[in-house]
Amino acid sequence: HVTTYAVIVLAILYLNDKGLMGYVNDNHLHDLGKFMFAFSIFWSYVWFEQFLLIYYANLPEETIYFLERWEGHNKIYKTSEILMVILNFLLPFLVLMTRDAKRTRIFLKIAAFLIIAGHYIDFYQMIMPGVVGKHGGYGLVEFGMVTVFASAFIYVISGELTKASLVAKNHPFLPEALHHDI
């Protein structure tokens, strides 16, 4: 999933900035950027294909999914739906298009944060219109839950990273991975 690659990129860049992963070079980052770019495009394909499948198969009982998000509940979800497509497809596509952008740390960080935010909105859009309807919206509870779970995730992962070596020293392909070149 593209969010996983976004989190991996952020973790690697953070550890590299702290000097714990000095062996990660621009070629490694380029490959991770390619994965983020590819899975972002794949997400867009699957999302649009869902719409096309409902439209071309003439499944009126399924159109409620899109109708509820575009026209229903006083159109409170329409802005989020548009923002979701921009954050998950358009901006990562534009940011990660060039080879140099996939090798530049700030562009990778920007794209990773955009993708994570976009996928939060994606999951929100899947659940909230059908569950709470017109009473939905972004408030303290939504941002609080993201903060709590992100903090717990960072706490657990940072605790686990202190317990093990970040390099598998006896792995047979380690020399090849350290000298990764594109």
Question: Which residues make up each language-model segment?
Answer:
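Long, contiguous internal "core" modules enriched in hydrophobic/ aromatic residues
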Residues: H1-E81
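Extracellular/periplasmic helix-loop-helix junctions in multi-pass membrane proteins
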Residues: A101-R105, M126-V141
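Extramembrane terminal tails and long inter-domain/linker segments of multi-pass membrane proteins
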Residues: L20-D26, F149-I182
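Hydrophobic cores of alpha-helical transmembrane segments in multi-pass inner/ER membrane proteins
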Residues: H1-L13, I86-P92, G144-E160
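Extended C-terminal subregions enriched in glycine
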Residues: K78-R105
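Hydrophobic, well-ordered secondary-structure elements that form the walls
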Residues: Y45, P92, F123, S165
